[in-house]
Amino acid sequence: MFDGNPGRRRLVLASGSPRRREMIAGLGCEFSIASADIDESVRPSEAAADYVERLAKEKATAVFEARGDQQDIVVLGADTTVVAGGDILGKPVDFDDAKAMLRRLSGTWHEVLTSVALVAAEGCKVTTTLSRVRFRELSEQEIQRYWDSGEPADKAGAYGIQGLAGSFVERVEGSYSSIVGLPLCETVVLLKEFGIKIWSD
């Protein structure tokens, strides 16, 4: 897609997520951070895949359009959501909300979708991955203690697989890094298409 000089392109991460920051840093990319303030509400009848793709695009586009150096940057936006029984489980608003989500995930399979969007002067490209996770049965005490840890408050589906909730997981099908918040394999392919260097370049 990009046919210019890759050395002059700078990556901007449109995310305040420490997890995504660590994962991008792990790819050996030089990057800056600029969080996007967008409405993350689900639209009526919006499918989960459409929802995460839209938010990833909107995050990247909002940061890109606010910049004055658009010819020199590539902006990466990402979004992750959890889907149970066809319903989108966003970030919990309080303990009761988190408890309801975790009860719903207990002992069952659910889906995790992550979209990554790259926006640059020449356009936008997005990729979406779907993974499946199965939780063991959770006790009420575990749910309460997990909430008390503070970990679920800012996470889709009220859990983070890379933290304490890793002990809830019986099986994973798909991309572990995507469940954490950034599908690394797919992200590297996009970065290379846009002329962004990683550790192996």
From Swiss-Prot:
Disulfide bonds: none annotated. Keywords: Cytoplasm, Hydrolase, Nucleotide metabolism. InterPro entries: ITPase-like_fam (IPR029001), Maf-like (IPR003697). It is found in: Cytoplasm. Its cofactor is a divalent metal cation. It catalyses: dTTP + H2O = dTMP + diphosphate + H(+); UTP + H2O = UMP + diphosphate + H(+). One of its GO terms (biological process) is nucleotide metabolic process. GO terms for cellular component: cytoplasm. GO terms for molecular function: dTTP diphosphatase activity; UTP diphosphatase activity. The record marks 19, 80, 162 as: Important for substrate specificity. Its EC number is 3.6.1.9. Gene3D superfamilies: 3.90.950.10. The keyword Secreted does not apply. The active site is at 79 (proton acceptor). Pfam families: Maf. Nucleoside triphosphate pyrophosphatase that hydrolyzes dTTP and UTP. May have a dual role in cell division arrest and in preventing the incorporation of modified nucleotides into cellular nucleic acids. Belongs to the Maf family. YhdE subfamily. This is dTTP/UTP pyrophosphatase.
